[in-house]
């Protein structure tokens, strides 16, 4: 199953909080600004950490933005970074994450999700996050 399907499943859990569905999601714990969870689908596991924005602008624009770091052991995928915005991204503008002098561009965009295409960049961004650095995500919605 693709990461998009897993993220969509996760968003359904977060949005509707249906107890029958939520039983498949196991919350592991909360660590500072991060929450860790495991989804078990058949015999496959998806482990991930998610963080909500500490600050959002504009404040009047309500959305369910998240930054994810996913692990899919059955597929030998580790440290996969993606974001969701709660709105469709504008493909005319780049989506970036900045922390100090470090800048990361999300190259793969599909509606309201975006991924880093380069594994080396994912590793660098993970190292930045491990240092406890704040990260600012910049993106534009489809309306501008």
Residue ranges and their predicted role:
Residues 22-144:
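A generic "folded-domain core" signal
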Residues 1-3:
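N-terminal secretory signal peptides that target proteins for export/translocation
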Residues 6-16:
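Sec-dependent N-terminal signal peptides
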């Amino acid at each position: 199953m693709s990461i998009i399907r897993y993220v969509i499943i996760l968003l359904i859990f977060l949005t509707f909080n249906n107890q029958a569905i939520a039983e498949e999601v196991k919350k592991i714990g909360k660590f500072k600004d991060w929450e860790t969870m495991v989804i078990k689908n058949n015999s496959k596991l998806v482990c991930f950490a998610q963080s909500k924005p500490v600050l959002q602008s504009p404040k009047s624009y309500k959305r369910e933005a998240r930054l994810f770091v996913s692990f899919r052991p059955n597929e030998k995928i580790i440290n996969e970074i993606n974001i969701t915005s709660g709105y469709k991204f504008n493909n005319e503008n780049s989506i970036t994450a900045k922390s100090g002098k470090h800048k990361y561009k999300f190259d793969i965009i599909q509606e309201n999700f975006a991924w880093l295409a380069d594994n080396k960049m994912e590793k660098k961004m993970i190292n930045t996050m491990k240092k406890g650095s704040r990260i600012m995500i910049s993106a534009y919605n489809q309306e501008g």
